[in-house]
Amino acid sequence: MQYKLPLNFVLSFCKDVIPDQGEDSYCYSFCDTAGMLGVFDGCGGAGAKKHDCYSGKTEAYIASRLCSGAFYDSFRRNFPNNMPAEKLAEEIFLPTALQRLKENEPDQDGIRITGSMVRTLPTTAAAALVRKAKGGMLEVSAFWAGDSRVYVLDKTGLAQLTQDDTSVADPMENLYEDGVLKNIFCSDRKVTLHTKTVTLKPPFIVLTATDGCFGYVSTPMEFEGILLHSLLNADNPKQWEQNMQEMIALSAGDDHTMCLAAFGYRGFVAIQRNLSKRYEEILNAYLNPVYALAQEDREGRQALWGKYRSDYMRYLEEKSE
């Protein structure tokens, strides 16, 4: 009998800072043995040009939607599929998205903006592909270009699966330094779609998020705190989704989009029980100490980040055997 994907539920939100002007997008799709979820952040600085052919929308707005549609269609047309993540990136996801962008390049009828940072139809991409593996395990493959992220959340804590394509590599430093994006989807420059694959035993949660979700806290552990606090104060998945969005919106200075999927739990209450101890751990070890620091005490925050970092970076800084 074929082992089916133990999906509990999918949550998503896509919130605009300026109503009806948001440049984020997302997608998700599932079959019996695989699932894909992703977020896409149209780059409003590099893609600020507006065009009549886009009904006055920016290239960033259009790019994120073209790219999310390309990933969605790629999954629907090609899965189930056992191809390695690297080949999926090179032969399916990347060329399909680039073709969509190229086919929809605008006529130059809009306001012309020039400069070395300007791109045609620029957007980030961060997608997670979850597939069944042997022995009841699940294979999680992250695909990304830019600074949107894929995470895994389990009782060990939150962990980043993607490495930001910016000039500042450290997640803590990235909150304080304005790193330059080095690699994004666009129709006029070379793009690299990175991959990272891990094999995990359920239960766990996979989430994809644009930088508006995690980029306006003072430390990475505060983002985990938002996820867990909002979970433990919810009665059902839909309320968790609402709680997360409301907490993120309190500090977000950008559009914020998330798509999340839970795997292998025996109901919503089981998720809360599984992760409640982790919340107590980070509340006592990291969150309460962070909240007690003066706003300007970056050194104190850095010290706490140094203790938290190893678990958070456990998949990006795996030690060789």
Question: What residues fall within each predicted segment?
Answer:
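N-terminal entry segment of metal-dependent catalytic domains or homologous docking segments
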Residues: M1-D73, S148, T195-T197
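Short hydrophobic beta-strand that contains or immediately precedes a catalytic carboxylate
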Residues: G38-F40, F143-A145, L207-A209
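Conserved, helical-rich catalytic subdomain that frames metal- and/or nucleotide-binding sites
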Residues: A159-V206, Y315
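Short Gly/Pro-enriched turn/cap motifs at secondary-structure boundaries
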Residues: K15-I18, G115-V118, I248-S251
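C-terminal catalytic subdomain
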Residues: R189-E321
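Helix-loop-helix
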Residues: K57, Y61-R100, G225-E246
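Catalytic core of PPM/PP2C metal-dependent serine/threonine phosphatase domains
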Residues: S25, F79-K155, L181-K201
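Short, surface-exposed, charged loop/turn segments at secondary-structure junctions
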Residues: A145, T156-A169, P220-L231
